[in-house]
Amino acid sequence: MPPTASLTRSPPTASQTRTLPRASRTRTPPRASLTRSPPTASLRRTPSRASRTRTPPRASLKRTPSRASLTRTLSRASLTRLKSRASHTRTPSRASLTRTPPTASRTRSLPRASRTRTPPRTSQRRMPPRTSQTRTPPRASLRRTPSRASRTRTPPRASLRRTPSRASLTRTPSRASLTRLKSRASHTRTPSRASLTRTPPTASLTRASRTRTPPRTSQTRTPPRASLRRTPSRASLTRTPSRASLTRTPSRASLTRLKSRASHTRTPSRASLTRTPPTASLTRTPPTASLTRTPPRASLTRSPPRASLTRTPPTASLTRSPPTASLTRTPPRASLTRSPPRASLTRTPSTASLTRTPSRASLTRSKSRASHTRTPSRASLTRTPPRASLTRTPPRASLTRSPPTASLTRMPPTASLTRSPPRASLTRTPPRASLTRSPSTASLTRTPPGTWLRRTPPRTSLTRTPPTASLTRTPYTASLTRTPYTASLMRMPYMTSLMTPYKAR
């Protein structure tokens, strides 16, 4: 099919420009009508409507045998025009729109060709005589045609000198035009719009996702994109895990483009956002919406003591509170919350041990939140709900025993610990740091005395916050947060057994 596409695009142009030069010149008014701004304006409005508007000229071209020559002259002259437009800010995306459908037709020629450009297809219908007549000699004459084109399109030929690959563009638009689009992508905003408009066809390129993509594009384009614009950082989050999972299906071609876009400044995130909605739907968007109700998170930032508490229960409430509460494993905390030992624990080592129970997962969450601006915590929350559902919901009842959490609320030291410098001095996280090295964690969990030995000096030595900061930076801790293994660690009575040496102290 690609050779036929190239034949339909270029050699017949030569032959027809040779055979019907006056006809094509007389037809230049319809060519102008094709290039008249109304269809281009419709292109600016909606790429799909642009394809629709392309269809009527297609029909009108079906009347004229020189339609193939028209389409070719359109591709050559109008592509030069579009390139000169591409020098302007927004239009290059339109040029890429007009060009990318043929690449789609090249990939899956018949169906998408029928969608995007029947002109090449009809020219293919005309093709057999034309190909038999003009196959190779017209190519040679094609190489001659630039001179003839120079009479008509001398300024575009100057632009041809800028991009000699345009002739090859008409034959293989994707390669040259993609390179051009990448050079456009070097510009700040427009390439992203081009990429946005381009991604729907790539999504349609994906075989089965073609049916999925229309709703996806319709969802992402207007409302969820705006909602995602509210949380751009979530885009950065979705880039790492969800985009990988997402991109497996549609994005092989589009992902490469998105990576080149991602290298660009701001809008690539919006492009990734357009992809994100499916991930949001995968993550059960209603909970994400409930998560997007950041007031509790804002309240986290508002009240430091409440922030310390909100690490576990409010985040739980954000993420369908009971399961995340079970995530935070309040049952062990409840055992901790037996206020007499906790009173004894209220001595800062006890707060450290206390925070150990909720904080390994929740503090890692807060660390990831601290590394990100604010929204990543929501992403981590969205991650936690399934884990929360995995955790026993019965602890929800134990959660309902709010007295332990209330006793936590009594912990102003934990609040002050939430203020990172005292937390660093408590260095709950530094021993957790040693724990978070999962091999050592495994060994530590198996050998609690070894853990105590390691923890006792490290707590003093690790009181230096820098290791905690480095922990905050490592996605490894985030992966630990994801692993149910750490969750199981938090659930383990092992945690309480760990606290016992501190109590002894």
Swiss-Prot record:
Q: Which domain of life is it from?
A: Eukaryota
> According to the UniProt record, where is the region Disordered?
1-474
UniProt biased composition (Polar residues) = 1-16, 66-78, 165-177, 188-200, 233-254, 265-293, 309-329, 345-365, 373-383, 399-408, 435-448
Which stretches are tagged as biased composition: Low complexity? 17-33, 40-59, 96-122, 129-140, 147-158, 201-226, 453-474
Query: What is the protein name for this chain?
Result: Putative uncharacterized protein ENSP00000383309
Task: Show the taxonomic lineage.
Answer: Eukaryota, Metazoa, Chordata, Craniata, Vertebrata
